[in-house]
């Protein structure tokens, strides 16, 4: 069974499954650093995406350029976890390492709220 971690954005908590079979090094580095507390930064220029600074680097694995809603990727050069709360047609490749499977609606709500109002606190934990 896939490993699950929690993603708390503002007042909403979602469940993410880790894609350990496709991005084992990235998943391992995330798990080693849990819990992570950070701040949401909305990627207004890119669309329905927000970013979270994370305290690790990992080489590219499972590269993805088209992002579906619920995808969670690592943009390694900037130590940024990218959370796509709706689909984004095209962008530079990043490591797809997790998928939101529980309470995507809550994450979408917080993402849209951050679009208008600014950042929100973020926690990632087991």
Regions found by a protein language model. Give the residues of each.
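Glycine-rich active-site loops that engage anionic ligands at enzyme catalytic sites
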Residues: 18-126
């Amino acid at each position: 069974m896939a490993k699950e971690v929690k993603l708390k954005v503002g007042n909403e908590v979602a469940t993410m499954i880790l894609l350990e079979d496709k991005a084992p090094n990235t998943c391992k580095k995330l798990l080693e650093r849990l819990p992570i507390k950070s701040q949401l930064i909305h990627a207004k220029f890119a669309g329905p995406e927000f970013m979270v600074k994370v305290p690790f680097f990992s080489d590219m694995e499972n590269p993805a350029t088209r992002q579906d809603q619920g995808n969670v990727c690592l943009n390694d050069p900037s130590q940024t976890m990218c959370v796509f709360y709706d689909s984004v047609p095209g962008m530079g490749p990043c490591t797809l390492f997790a998928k939101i499977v529980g309470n995507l609606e809550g994450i979408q709500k917080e993402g849209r709220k951050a679009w208008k109002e600014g950042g929100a606190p973020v926690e990632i934990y087991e």
